[in-house]
Amino acid sequence: MKAFVIDVARCNGCMNCQIACKDEHCGTDWLPYAAEQPLTGQFWCKVEEKVRGSVPKTRITYVPHIGGQSDALAAAAGDAIVERPDGLMYLDPEKAKGRKDLCEFEGVYWNEALQIPQTCTGCAHLLDDGWEVPRCVDSCPTEALRFGDVADLDLDGAEQLVEGSRIWYRNLPKRFVTGCVVDFDAREVAIGADVKLVSASGNTVAEQKTDEFGDFMFDQVEPAAYQVVYQVPGKTAKTYDADATELDVNIGDVPVA
């Protein structure tokens, strides 16, 4: 069975995959797999930009999304979807007419002019023509997108956003907790301060020392409520709450005592 593996840590947001998909499918139909994709309003391959943290401790994470390749969509679509021998699926442009209900699935878009739902086909027409990978994968300069037989792909630690999907992800962003320890009296940052990230149950999740800029960052921690406990030699330990349940947390510049 064919599948995609997307390594979020490798994606730099160049949008090549998104542009290549539009280039391949806009202005051309590839029947029986797909009718022409509209110039606007549809992104069968779409790169989501996530701005995380707060100034000056911010990060931008890019997450490519590819639609249409899931068992859930197949179950809902019935005979309007076709599964190829290689496992790729596509919505039949003729049999799917009028099925606007299928647009509730991620990456499925409604074509008002043609009255059909449309989504990724895995560039089945190119695979039939001898290509080894779809356009989006071929255009990725960092190899963030990979495509092939499941048995040949490295799925160790990979996860699906949708159960039964042919799209697997590696290094999906979790949360980060960051800050800077400052000696305001001396007008200097605190280098080498001990910092711990402590869970609600009191367990130390991670620990590190502040760097040459007085900064610390606990990256890829699970979404949860934490406490940051830090101590500068010769000073009393201090504690700050850091609720990373919903968002990444920057506790800002904090005093040594």
State what each model feature region is:
Residues 91-93, 215-220:
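Exposed aromatic-hydrophobic patches
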Residues 175-177, 184-201:
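Short, ordered, surface-exposed loop/turn motifs in non-cytosolic proteins
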Residues 29-75, 79-80, 90-180:
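Flanking helices and flexible, charged tails adjoining ferredoxin-like Fe-S electron-transfer domains
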Residues 200-215:
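Short, acidic Ser/Thr/Gly-rich low-complexity loop/linker segments typical of extracellular
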Residues 233-257:
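Structured interaction patches on ligand/partner-binding surfaces of diverse proteins
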